[in-house]
Amino acid sequence: MINRKNTYKSKSNNETDDKKAKSALQHCSRNNGVRTPGPAVLTALRKPAAFALLICIGATAILGCSGGESLAPVKPERAAEQTDSPVPNPTQVLSGDYIPPVQTPLPLPADEPNPFETELQFNNENFARAFKYKYGSICVSDRSSIAELHLRRCGLMYIDDLTKFGYLRVLDLSENMIYDLSPIEKLTALRKLNLDTNNISDISHLSELTELLELDIDKNNISNLYPLTPLKNMTKLLAHENEIHDLQPLSELTKLQKLGLRSNSISDLRPLSKLVELRELYLHDNSISDISPLSELHELRRLNLHDNVLSDISELRSLENMERLWIYNNSISDISALAGMKELSVLYAGMNSIEDISSLAELVNLTDVSLHNNAITDVSALEEHVNLKKLDLSGNPLDDSAVEVLCTLTGLEKLDLQRTGISQEGIAAIRAALPKANVLA
């Protein structure tokens, strides 16, 4: 017997399901252009699994209506409507739009400080103290901005690892007690290095600093200059007061313009003959007797040879660009080689055996001349040298015949005539003629 009640109930449920499915698809039809299904489709969708799938598709379609992509093709007339609709303001947030979260970096934990904001640390306590005294506290992030370090007279015996300062161009460690230069060898970007007045004897760690332009190693215990041979870009080298005697390592440093070798044990100047760009050369207080290798250094402007064992300076004749020359305290008697130095302004030639100064007659640019303690009796070569500011003739056997010439030097500011044979009357006449000059007698 057929249960009509159950059949009716089943039919009623099917009709209800048909209405729900049809309603869902009509909603999608209004929003996405999906066609309303026929009875066959509705019959297939009466099964629970199919109906659940339909609900998922409907939900996706509804989300697509709100801002996503449509699940079904859009009718031509609907596409036209969408094309004609005004484009919303891109800054305007529409209801239902998906807004991505703002990507922000995660903060560091409170117990983990930013490594770039921590204070720069040094291994050597004494170095750290000197650095902090000069520069205060420096963060790790600031080290790349440090191009110069000036740690002069800080009582340093050791240098800390300075490789952390990769951009360092200038380093001044003068007047300390440093003897080990190994921490410097990796500072290959250095342009200027001052190691004046330390306890250095070994400079082998400097051989890698090929970009170095200026080096000061004055007042140390250095005897071997061979580690400097690779430093071919150097233009300035100061090595006063060391134990240097061999200059051969310098022969290849042809870009040198200033070279200081005062107070060493130098006697042979031949390696310097190739340094044709030299403009300043300081060789005083050595054991030099032969200066012929200097004859090719035509660019020389300043040359200091005082306190050596020179007797012949004829090789200086070709150095016509000379501006300042120091040759005092030697055994020189002839200065005729100076006649062609038209640019000479400073001449210190005291404590020699000079009698004749006629070679100075044409050197009208002279401003400062010292000829003390020689054997000069005639100063007529200096007549009307109005550019002279300072003149030292002390310790020469002059007499009153020099008074007339000296009265013509109206530009003088200081005149030393002590220990000469000029009378008091002659001194008085000179003072009257040169009221602006300080005349010592």
Language-model regions, residue ranges each:
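Thr-biased low-complexity repeat/linker tracts and other Thr-enriched repetitive architectures
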Residues: 257, 265-267, 274-276, 287-289, ...
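Gram-positive cell-envelope targeting signals
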Residues: 1-83
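Leucine-rich repeat
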Residues: 143, 164-168, 184-190, 206-212, ...
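Conserved hydrophobic beta-strand positions in leucine-rich repeat
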Residues: 147-149, 171-173, 193-195, 213-217, ...
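Ankyrin-repeat and related helical/solenoid repeat scaffolds used for protein-protein interactions
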Residues: 365-422
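N-terminal capping/linker segments that flank leucine-rich repeat
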Residues: 65-166, 170, 183, 227, ...
